[in-house]
Every structure is written in C-alpha cells, then in structure tokens.
Amino acid sequence: MRVILLGPPGAGKGTQAKLISEKFSIPHISTGDIFRANIKEKTPLGIEAKRYMDNGQLVPDEVTIGIVKDRLTKDDCDNGFLLDGFPRTVAQAEALDEFLKGINKELDVALLIKVPEEFILERMTGRRVCTSCGASYHIRFNPPKIEGKCDICDNELIQRKDDTEATVKERLEVYSKQTYPLINYYKDNGIISEVNGTESIDEVFGNISNILGRDK
C-alpha cells in the first residue's frame, strides 16, 4: 500500500497518518522528519539542504527529491509507505512517479482530507496553549474551566503566532496555490480518493480504512 496524504493545514493529517501507519503496518514518512534526520546525520544531501536553509533559501527540488528517494529505498518501505508533506508541486509529483515506476512501486492512492476554510479557521484560531506547562485547549471544543487560565497549573493561556487568523489565512492561500494543481494531477491519473475531514477522528479514519482496504 503506497499512499500520498494531502490536505490543508489543520485538516488532521498528522493524527490520521499515525493511525494509518499503525493499522496498515507501513511507515509514516514526513518530509520534515527526514529533512531533520539528514541534517542531523550530516548526509551529503542533508549538508546541501542545510546550506540553502541557513541562507534563507528554498531547498531546490533535486535535493528534496533526492532525500525522499533515499528514504523510499529503505527496507521498511518494501510493503508500502505513507508520504506526508511531499510532493508539494506537480513537478515534484512527476519526478516521484518517474522514480517509483522505475522501481516498480507506483502509487496506489492519493488520499485527500477535505476541510472547508471556515472550519479550519475555527479549528486553528481557537487553539490555546499554557505558557507554563504546555497543556493545549480549544475555546470551543476543549475550553478551560476558567477562561484564559490553565486547568492544570492556573497559568495564562495564549494563542500561538502560527494560530492567528492572518497566519492561518496566509498558510491556506499558499496551500491552495500549490496543492490544487497537484490534486488535479492525481485526479487525471485516476488515483485520488477524498474523505470529509470535518467528521470525528474515528469517523474520518473509518472512511480512510474503507478506501485503503479497497485498494490493498
């Protein structure tokens, strides 16, 4: 089972990726994680990626693709994998497809978790975190007993900069520009499947399991 996971920020991809990985016994490959691992281990590609990042530049596709390719050739990917955070563009998707075709491991499913923008805004802008113990809350879905105060240590709750409305809208705009062409690419290839990400975690995972079960 070889899967690409797509969806906007705040769609719950991380939660679902963990559940998919456990149920179907395939590694969850997050591009952020493998970048950090390559940089930490000082691999040739990691050193090159760090050089661009230290200069405030985007890491070129050939470096990113090289890091992903290297990870996909590991033994734990023999029976499948779940890719999260890559590809981000059609050019990256084409390069990935060419590589996978060459090793007879073509993608089975591009799984899209669909969530309306207004739902994501409510979900992300409502998040609050304790300045002291790090406990997480949500002003609507998981509110503290006393507004603005942590239930555990009574310290102040704050909204992280990443969760402000302006930041969330900016991230959604970037996602739309990058990912809509990618969604159409996988639609044209006939491998995209969509699930409603506004349902509960269990309901979303149940729908995902049905899709992946069909494609096994």
UniProtKB/Swiss-Prot annotation:
Subcellular location(s) of the protein: Cytoplasm
EC number in record: 2.7.4.3
Binding-site positions, Zn(2+): 130, 133, 150, 153
Taxonomy of the source species: Bacteria, Bacillati, Bacillota, Clostridia, Eubacteriales
Gene3D superfamilies registered for this protein in UniProt: P-loop containing nucleotide triphosphate hydrolases
The keyword NAD is annotated on this UniProt entry: no
Alphabetical UniProt keywords: ATP-binding, Cytoplasm, Kinase, Metal-binding, Nucleotide biosynthesis, Nucleotide-binding, Transferase, Zinc
Domain commentary: Consists of three domains, a large central CORE domain and two small peripheral domains, NMPbind and LID, which undergo movements during catalysis. The LID domain closes over the site of phosphoryl transfer upon ATP binding. Assembling and dissambling the active center during each catalytic cycle provides an effective means to prevent ATP hydrolysis. Some bacteria have evolved a zinc-coordinating structure that stabilizes the LID domain.
Subunit structure of this chain's protein: Monomer.
Role, per record: Catalyzes the reversible transfer of the terminal phosphate group between ATP and AMP. Plays an important role in cellular energy homeostasis and in adenine nucleotide metabolism.
Provenance organism: Clostridium botulinum (strain Loch Maree / Type A3)
Protein name as annotated: Adenylate kinase
Residues involved in ATP binding: 10-15, 127, 136-137, 199
Main location: cytoplasm
Region (LID): 126-163
Annotated catalysed reactions: AMP + ATP = 2 ADP
Pathway: Purine metabolism; AMP biosynthesis via salvage pathway; AMP from ADP: step 1/1
GO cellular component: cytoplasm
List of residues binding AMP: 31, 36, 57-59, 85-88, 92, 160, 171
Family under the similarity heading: Belongs to the adenylate kinase family.
